[in-house]
């Protein structure tokens, strides 16, 4: 079975410079009532969903090895409706950092999203849409902080204990902009999986319900988002 990810753009780059600036998102204003009803329905389905604040991108370019851009703050209900409805405003992007977690034996690990999450059942690298915790006092979106925070929250692993790849990988799938950083552990895939599962077992509401080992294309699964498959295909090309 083929799990190829067509029309996916992958670019290697070195640095991220994204400002956080005020911006009026017309989609969120024009469809306010529909958005509120949609979120209420989604929250009835998954009561753990919370309408917090998130950061989205409204402009970007990669130039001279640097990803430049402008981001804005909005609420999660706006983001969720925009995503669930197929990106009706194609000038906005869901940018996020993702940890391409690699074991010492060369296998990669992905997590199965827990039933309480909006992406239940999907197989993801540790990642998450940035929120105000990832904004510096100088109004810069720090996606390195976003990466470290999501990795720690979802796996219990400190980024400083892992060997970081030299560059970022930009993977665009429609309005999803995944910024992946390879992080290599000292443990084998099996030992790393066991360690993360112990962490998940200590959490009251873990974001992952299981950890899968991916040793090659034969382990691809339809529950993997296109950006995960595209990144791994590029690794094993």
Please provide the spans of the model-predicted regions:
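N-terminal leader/linker segments that precede catalytic domains of diphosphate-processing enzymes
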Residues: 1-125, 129-149, 157-237
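Short alpha-helical functional segments enriched in proximate histidine and acidic residues
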Residues: 154
């Amino acid at each position: 079975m083929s799990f190829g990810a067509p029309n996916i753009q992958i670019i290697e780059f070195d640095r991220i410079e994204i400002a956080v600036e005020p911006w009026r998102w017309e989609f969120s204003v024009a469809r306010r009532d529909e958005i509120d009803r949609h979120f209420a329905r989604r929250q009835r389905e998954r009561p753990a969903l919370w309408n917090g604040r998130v950061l989205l991108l409204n402009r970007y370019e990669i130039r001279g090895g640097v990803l430049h851009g402008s981001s804005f703050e909005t609420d999660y209900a706006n983001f969720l409706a925009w995503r669930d409805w197929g990106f009706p405003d194609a000038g906005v992007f869901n940018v996020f950092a993702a940890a391409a977690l690699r074991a010492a034996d060369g296998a990669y690990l992905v997590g199965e999203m827990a039933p309480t999450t909006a992406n239940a059942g999907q197989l993801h690298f540790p990642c998450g849409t940035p929120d105000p915790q990832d904004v510096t006092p100088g109004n810069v979106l720090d996606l390195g902080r976003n990466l470290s925070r999501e990795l720690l929250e979802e796996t219990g692993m400190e980024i400083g204990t892992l060997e970081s790849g030299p560059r970022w990988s930009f993977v665009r799938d429609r309005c999803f902009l995944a910024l992946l950083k390879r992080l290599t552990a000292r443990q084998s895939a099996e030992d790393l999986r066991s360690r993360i599962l112990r962490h998940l077992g200590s959490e009251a509401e873990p974001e992952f319900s299981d950890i899968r080992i991916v040793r090659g294309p034969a382990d691809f699964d339809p529950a993997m988002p296109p950006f995960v498959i595209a990144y791994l295909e590029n690794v094993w090309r």
